[in-house]
Amino acid sequence: MKALTSALVLLFSVAAHAGDARQLAKLPAPAEATLREEMLDNLVTLNEILGLVVAGKVKEAGEVAEKKLGTSTMGRHRNKPFEARPGPHMPPAMHELAMKGHQAATAFAAVAATGDREKTLAALPTLNSACVSCHLAYRVR
């Protein structure tokens, strides 16, 4: 049974990538692990921001956006070994999208800091546009 399960997992993973036209960004294993952990953290943060906006806590949502996603977070991996730092191993266009994502979070934070709920809601889709663009264009596996 274990062999059958393993074969099915392999078959489905090969089939899943067969139609995947995204560019493979081959990163060293430690950098890939760092990036995947960061992406999961970003999803949790986006969910937190959405919850705060819905609750009417737009200023707090902006603070979270800057603290966890904004330009102030750039370079957070600088103390890791080079092989564990995703940025230097990314294709240049992928790295540019990552920078745009940080910049978008900072721009969203500035809008949210005004406390204007309507403007914050209007800015919300820009918060993850670079994320979506990057995930549509690149994969690490």
Language model segments and positions:
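Sequence context surrounding c-type heme c attachment/ligation sites in exported
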Residues: 19-141
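Residues in flexible loops and secondary-structure boundaries
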Residues: 9-12, 61
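N-terminal signal peptide c-region/cleavage motif recognized by signal peptidases
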Residues: 13-18
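Sec-dependent signal peptide recognition
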Residues: 1-9
